[in-house]
Design a protein with these regions (language model features):
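Short, intrinsically disordered, charge-balanced linker/junction segments flanking boundaries
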Residues: 1-2, 175-182
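A helix-coil-helix interface module used to build multimeric assemblies
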Residues: 3-152, 163-173
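Short coil/turn connectors between adjacent alpha-helices in alpha-solenoid helical repeat scaffolds
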Residues: 157-159
Length: 182
């Protein structure tokens, strides 16, 4: 299908040329963010305009994008948390022999060291890190389920070929850097 290859090539050529002005104007008219960008991309890729959104619902685009953004945010939090733990560990080591007073129930208790107290703070962050890594390792895309969770738009696109439909979510997950979809 020469036509298909031309359409794909045209989209690849313009994949990073986001025409925000056209999308913004179109959104004023249709009040739909995804379809406004589909329209703007279609203006840049006239050969591909008819296939840009083929099979994909707006929920497919928006919901999966939200998961991708959340995943990127979790990566940033993870990096910062690891750095905080490393700095607290250095602080604890530096002050491991500096005496201070420990508290329990906001009442003075017994002598300890600043370093020991810092290890307790660090432990809290280590538990947070463990939880964060669990969330990151189990995060999944929503996949191609669409608005109603049935993949109806893709079933229609592929003439009800369930075998093909079953291959879509693993492909989407792999392409987006995830292990799987729901």
């Amino acid at each position: 299908c020469i036509r298909d290859r031309e359409q794909i090539d045209e989209m690849k050529e313009h994949v990073y040329d986001i025409n925000y002005d056209v999308a913004k104007e179109r959104e004023k008219l249709v009040r739909h963010d995804v379809m406004s960008h589909v329209y703007a991309f279609g203006q840049q890729c006239p050969k591909a305009a008819g296939i840009i959104h083929l099979g994909a619902t707006s929920c497919y685009v928006g919901d999966n994008t939200d998961i991708i953004i959340m995943n990127e945010a979790l990566k940033l939090v993870h990096k910062k948390l690891v750095n905080v733990i490393a700095e607290l560990a250095k602080f604890a080591d530096t002050y491991k022999n500096l005496p201070t007073l420990a508290f329990t129930h906001f009442q003075p208790a017994q002598p300890t060291t600043v370093g020991k107290r810092a290890t307790l703070w660090t432990q809290e962050f280590l538990m947070d890190l463990e939880d964060l890594e669990y969330v990151m390792s189990t995060l999944k895309l929503l996949g191609s389920k669409g608005t109603t969770g049935t993949q109806a738009s893709f079933l229609e696109l592929f003439d009800g070929d369930q075998e093909t439909i079953d291959k879509i979510d693993p492909m989407i997950a792999a392409k987006m850097g995830f292990k799987e979809c729901y």
